[in-house]
Amino acid sequence: SQDTVFRIYSMTKPVTGVAMMILFEEGKWRLDDPVTRYVPEFKNLRVVKSISKDGKMELEDMKRPPTMREIMSHTAGFGYGLADEHPVDKMFREKEVLSSTSLKQMVDRVATIPLMFQPGTNWYYSASVDIQGYIVEKLSGQTLGQFMQNRIFAPLKMPDTAFFTGPEKANRLAAVYMFDRDLGKIVEAKQLFGVDMPDYTKPPAAESGGGGLVSTTMDYARFSQMLANGGELDGVRILSPATVELMGTNVIPKNVLVSNNGTGVASFNEAVGFGLDFQVATDA
């Protein structure tokens, strides 16, 4: 029904992107700033130079830190730890980056893992939007959830969008199902990408800007319509038209458009690119 609350996973990413761009419009950061200006924990990141047949990585120094533009377009070099078997993704799983108990702990764990490639040289679906969530908190002085509530959800009248439902809406939360190959049938999911399903009725230990929100179809439609309208809905302006246009403009050079997706299930082609926290059509 229209009242059903869903875990929206990576549809959280454009919301975090809007939060970032609100702060961008306030002059809190610039696209070509090094991310180390806001996350100094990343100053000593190493980079994978090569991988041997037995999976051992040869590392080198960063030629330069990733820029804010690159963390918003998945070209910074971070891994994710989802389905891919790249050694960096394995380290994300081993260090339980996606199970961190705070965004600071998440950043500290990422800081111990090398980048997959030199910043700006490739595209890889990554944990960079979770890093953006940490930056939103640092620049705003609020938790990510508080900032989103104050600057996005309340103004747009999105009452059912948050990082948890609370007990009063628990009965409206849709279950997640998956196909169990061993049982040969569809069952309720207990894990996703090897991570235990969190209790979405309670506040999370770490608010994931990359995939932690719950929402309804009607709430998310209002968010989407705001973007389609150039940053405004029902007389409430969240972003300027120029900023929304900037978000939807491809920022990926042609030489890195065709690249494996970090989840191992998709790839870019010449008709699509990536803007600031969402994919864009380049032939529209």
Q: What is the meaning of each model-derived region?
A:
Residues 1, 31, 277-280:
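A short, well-structured edge-of-sheet supersecondary motif
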Residues 1, 36, 248:
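Residue-level detector of conserved, well-ordered beta-strand and adjacent loop positions
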